[in-house]
């Protein structure tokens, strides 16, 4: 009698995806982030579901319903802060996951990479809508500023913005629809994750050397399940430390004041994980130009396979490219810092320099450095 794990139509799929999956024997901890993102999204859906049981998507009661969750619901404060800080963890892992993909040339798997970029856009949109729901000052003004960017689209812009708002300003209709979209989007994300994994398992995982590893594969279970569990425990340690010791560390104090359309906060800024893109948006004085730069700052990831000029896939044996990648990371940290600063000198010029260098590193320096490395190796 054959093993049920290998014969049952449903269990067989799980077996081929997580148990008997042939995996390169040398993948490092950088390959842990995929599974951590899966766990993160599951946690977000569970905590979000419990929050939705008590939350009311109405401008008059939204803010007080969040207060009610924190004060009166059993462990409501824990659910709320686990959800808010879980989003931060999600983005940290997302950026690590993308960074690993760039470093080791994982973007060569075109379908997996492109579905991943669609996932990134979907997660960013979902997180943005979630930030609006508590209906604090930064929620309201963040929603107003970011949705207003669409008015820069020629001809249809202003109509489009009013259509999204459901009126002439961010109001009850906007909050209700944002809650509906914020609720449905994680399930759409989960469907995209399945497609992402489907494409990945067509080719198999990449590995740190960037070489074909077909001759050296090991089963996913128990080797990588135990490794993933270690990553999971470390993630839970970080998340619980953040949630229990400093839950408001990554939040904005302005969001503890209820939304007031008549009072603009001195510095409107999004959550920390969007600050790099926000800095790029602000560094261009033209509205449409800023919006295009903002979109292109993420969309540029789709060009990476076309910009890959090296004859090696991974950066493991390419020290010059490694230096450039770490320069890019430093640049993104600077952009994140600038995004949280007021629009005044010297921050304006630092932001403009960092924005220009961001695009220069990816579009010009990285491809030319790769060509130079090819020459150094006489290839």
Swiss-Prot record:
Q: Which domain of life is it from?
A: Eukaryota
Which compartments does it reside in? Mitochondrion inner membrane
Is the keyword Amino-acid biosynthesis assigned to this protein? no
Gene Ontology terms for molecular function: metal ion binding; ubiquinol-cytochrome-c reductase activity
Q: Where does a ubiquinone bind?
A: 201
Protein's name in the database: Cytochrome b
Query: So what family is this one in?
Result: Belongs to the cytochrome b family.
Gene Ontology biological process terms in this record: mitochondrial electron transport, ubiquinol to cytochrome c
Looking at the UniProt entry, the stretches that span the membrane are 33-53, 77-98, 113-133, 178-198, 226-246, 288-308, 320-340, 347-367
Q: Which organism is it from?
A: Trinomys setosus
Required co-factor?
heme b
Q: How is the cofactor bound?
A: Binds 2 heme b groups non-covalently.
Relate the protein's function as given in its record.
Component of the ubiquinol-cytochrome c reductase complex (complex III or cytochrome b-c1 complex) that is part of the mitochondrial respiratory chain. The b-c1 complex mediates electron transfer from ubiquinol to cytochrome c. Contributes to the generation of a proton gradient across the mitochondrial membrane that is then used for ATP synthesis.
**Residues noted as binding heme b b566 in the record, renumbered to the chain:** 97, 196
Share what the entry says about its subunit structure, partners included: The cytochrome bc1 complex contains 11 subunits: 3 respiratory subunits (MT-CYB, CYC1 and UQCRFS1), 2 core proteins (UQCRC1 and UQCRC2) and 6 low-molecular weight proteins (UQCRH/QCR6, UQCRB/QCR7, UQCRQ/QCR8, UQCR10/QCR9, UQCR11/QCR10 and a cleavage product of UQCRFS1). This cytochrome bc1 complex then forms a dimer.
Keywords from the named record:
Electron transport, Heme, Iron, Membrane, Metal-binding, Mitochondrion, Mitochondrion inner membrane, Respiratory chain, Transmembrane, Transmembrane helix, Transport, Ubiquinone
- Where on this chain does heme b b562 bind? 83, 182
According to Swiss-Prot or TrEMBL, what is its membrane topology?
Multi-pass membrane protein
What extra comment accompanies this record? Answer: Heme 1 (or BL or b562) is low-potential and absorbs at about 562 nm, and heme 2 (or BH or b566) is high-potential and absorbs at about 566 nm.
Q: Which GO terms describe its cellular component?
A: mitochondrial inner membrane; respiratory chain complex III
